[in-house]
């Protein structure tokens, strides 16, 4: 486990930057090249979004269940680091889960209970107070996690990664531990959720943890075009800083199941559907305009914030997911920037099982 106090974190950051700049004296020229390449990708996202089109790939569950997934779609998923997989569960079943969760919240008098850890963790990410419920083991959640359709979905996604090499298996793509997470139930008109853009799976760890250093070695060597974001090597060894609401387990993909109809404007998920943004985020602190002790949105025990101050180019590519229906699922790579719309302008509850 990484145990850093703020002073140690700052000292290590200063040393890290000095060593990097000494090793790569022409780094800023290389960074300009990276910026140009990312600008091209971001402009495509902007253009498609202005036309009402999404660059987040979509796939029907029954296609990969029957082995009928076009290689072009696979390429799009890996390039964007995200995908909407439709019809994983029947609509009526997802709607029944939603009703059972509403009943569960009332029967357990949820609103009178203390909900501490999440609020502290998201203290720099929220506009006000998240409407994400600290409920993990309801019947609906357990059924969704253990369903055969979910197992097939996760297996398909896991197999997009390089999970073994030279006889070493980094993880088993068809076998997972049960991962318990929360639920979202957001009422129409709500303006309090507003999770600003961020990445999970650590913040300062991405620069200072030895396993992450090996994971991102090509990026830190400024050979960004050689970096493989789907390599399972080393990433599973990364250790997270202790925090009340941080998942320290290795996750190939993060995701949720829709329990209600929701789309742009409905207070739902936003993504930057571009897997290459991780190189920009890791390299941005190395530029001379950043104070030596600053890692551009990274603080111990917090999610990695992506802000207008340091990442304005990337935020141009932040888009809402396409409309999804109950039973659809949405997935994104652990290095993909994501957030939640500030305002729910829709007419019905926006609800998901994480």
Task: Give the label of every model feature segment.
Residues 324-338:
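Conserved metal-binding segment of the jelly-roll/cupin
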Residues 258, 272, 332-333, 354:
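Generic beta-strand/beta-sheet core signal
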Residues 346-354:
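Aromatic sugar-binding interfaces of carbohydrate-active proteins
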Residues 1-79:
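Fe(II)/2-oxoglutarate
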Residues 3, 72, 77-80, 89-310, ...:
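Non-heme Fe(II) oxygenase catalytic core, chiefly the N-lobe of the double-stranded beta-helix
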Residues 83:
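Short acidic/polar active-site loop segments enriched in Thr and Asp
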Residues 283, 334, 340, 353:
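Ligand-binding pocket scaffold of soluble enzyme catalytic domains
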């Amino acid at each position: 486990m990484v145990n850093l106090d703020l002073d140690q974190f700052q000292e290590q950051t200063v040393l890290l930057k000095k060593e990097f700049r000494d090793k790569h004296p022409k780094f800023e020229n290389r960074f300009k090249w990276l910026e140009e390449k990312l600008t091209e990708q971001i402009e495509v996202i902007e253009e498609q979004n202005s036309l009402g089109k999404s660059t987040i790939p979509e796939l029907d569950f029954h296609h990969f269940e029957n082995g009928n997934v076009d290689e072009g779609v696979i390429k799009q998923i890996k390039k964007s680091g995200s995908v909407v997989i439709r019809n994983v569960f029947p609509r009526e079943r997802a709607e029944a889960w939603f009703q059972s969760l509403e009943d569960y919240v009332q029967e357990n008098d949820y609103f009178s209970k203390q909900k501490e850890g999440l609020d502290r963790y998201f203290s720099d990410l929220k506009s006000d107070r998240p409407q994400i419920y600290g409920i993990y083991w309801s019947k609906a959640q357990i059924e969704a996690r253990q369903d055969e359709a979910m197992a097939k979905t996760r297996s398909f996604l896991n197999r997009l990664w390089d999970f073994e090499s030279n006889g070493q298996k980094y993880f088993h793509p068809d076998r997972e531990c049960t991962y318990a997470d929360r639920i979202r139930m957001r009422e129409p008109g709500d303006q309090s959720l507003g999770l600003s853009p961020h990445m999970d799976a650590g913040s300062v760890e991405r620069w200072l943890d030895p396993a992450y250093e090996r994971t991102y070695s090509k990026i830190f060597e400024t050979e960004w075009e050689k970096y493989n974001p789907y390599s399972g090597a080393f990433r599973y060894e990364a250790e997270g800083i202790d925090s009340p609401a941080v998942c320290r387990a290795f996750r190939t993909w993060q995701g949720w199941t829709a329990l209600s109809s929701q789309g742009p404007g409905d207070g739902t998920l936003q993504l930057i559907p571009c897997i290459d943004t991780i190189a920009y985020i890791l390299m941005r602190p190395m530029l001379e305009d950043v104070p030596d002790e600053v890692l551009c949105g990274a603080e111990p025990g917090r999610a990695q914030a992506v802000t207008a101050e340091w990442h304005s180019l990337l935020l141009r590519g932040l888009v809402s997911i396409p409309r999804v229906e109950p039973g659809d699922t949405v997935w994104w790579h652990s290095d993909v920037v994501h957030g939640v719309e500030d305002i729910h302008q829709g007419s019905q509850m926006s609800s998901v099982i994480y």
